């Protein structure tokens, strides 16, 4: 009698567990709008109620089988849980470079929310958890490209807002050399740079400033082809030329300084949107030419937030990235600083678009209209280089220009184009030391990964061990970093 009561009580508990799990699972399916997941419901029912499938058969075994399978079971469960959580809710991201300093620092570990902008349904769902694109040590792909699902984003808490710090997939990372030392390089920039050198050596280099738009297009096609063919002919040096799907490209983090439909222009380092100046981040950095009377004191560097990387740049080139606060402090230090001034010769070459001459610099750029979903733009040979990548690569159209300069999209003469996606303009706060939209263009909406919420760990690469922990940054909310 007692055993029967216990059995009945146990079944009630199992039914309660099943009801809770089923309700949560159905809510999840409603959220992601995927009723295909209903095929899992019978298995959930079996786990809690019918128990027809002996899910944990290994518990009946003796010896090493039971021990090994218990660890395998725990490991598989952990990997599946991590995969699911990283895909739909949040993931960890570490700041690898100084492009957002001094807002986010090298060595900051971020809690990145997928729910803020809505998680993407994965394009390549079959991937090894905790990897982005490559298995460590063996240097092979950590994912398979079948099945490949089209872009779709689940409803989130909101949209990307102006001046948000955003994690996204690197737009120019669709094609790369798989030799490890070149994987982080911009493949398109490599092709144009190498091609330019080849044409110069062959006496075929031209002054692009005097060419009309159609002549420029043909010339840059020749430059790109020369560079790509050279890279393809040197697999021992560069490896194979490979492609990566959107969700397997490197993760970048920058600040969104331009939204879909806005016209962006940079004038004397200030970003203007639709003619109005956008507020600079509090800790924005520019590089300064500086001449010292002696050695730079380490204590002063720590006080002003100047890193070893910053000092190395100064020792190599005579320029140093500084916030306004650091600049004013050094300018006032007459005993140390002989002269200091803004670097007006900051990096200017190799700007987007790579296949046209614009005369723009990283401090004076544009204007460019940022594409907005459903909006159209009149196409001509002058603005085509700016929007060609959006039309061809990100939105999957066939685009050609004939010998007369006529533009054809999917075989039809095109005078205009209507965009299918929203696009964003991303820049680092370290304005003279950031590879961003000025160099590789727009960020499509399907590349948006998530929003950093807070810094859960921070360790300075300049100070090893316990002394490098930045206690004052732990659990700081990223939205408070303006």
Model-derived regions: residue spans:
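Extended hydrophobic leader/signal-anchor segments used for secretion and membrane insertion
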Residues: 1-482
